[in-house]
Amino acid sequence: GNNLAQVTPAPIDLPVVGVVNDFYEAREGMKVTFVDSLTVSEYFELARFGQIELFEGGRPRQFTETAPPSVAGYTAHLEALSRRRVIVDDDDNGQNVSLNDPNGSQFIYHPTANGGFSVGTQGSDFFRGGDLVSGLTGVLDWSFAGASGTDAWRIRPTAANPATFTVANPRPATPPAVGGAIRAVGMNLLNYFTTIDTTASTGSGPCAPDGLQD
């Protein structure tokens, strides 16, 4: 039978001390509990892979928001984040699993035990960045999310101990005042080329607006 409920979880207190991989490898496959309150901070891969990232000590800031640009400083910043990060995974390596509800609406849910999804805490179908998870319990696992290059340490919540989200960053009822008029502008920096007319092609010509490769 399944005796997982009889196992006493090993406590983990973040940030990790020592080598992160060594720390987690010594606990791989174990049922663990994080003693810290963790903050929902990253959910870019939620819809694709069914995973979110939680951090001890609050939501992390961009390095240059609190420090001047520095290669060494940024490296240390990433190292510090790796000691505070927890990936909660839905234990389903399928990509872009359909999240449509029976009524045809598409919702984004937070991952829970057994590869499923459930409703969030701020309404019928979502959580927000900044919400909290306390007493996170699950099986520690090293695996990929569903695509190559995504190997990482992950927590798989169990049916007996699903992740519970507490509202800590409620959605404002009305947009906050910005203190004046603003003008929004945008620029496509992903295609901001300085060599658009330079090409190694001998037959297609340059990539200019009137070129054959546009």
Language-model segments: what does each one mean?
Residues 1-213:
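Extended non-catalytic accessory segments flanking core domains
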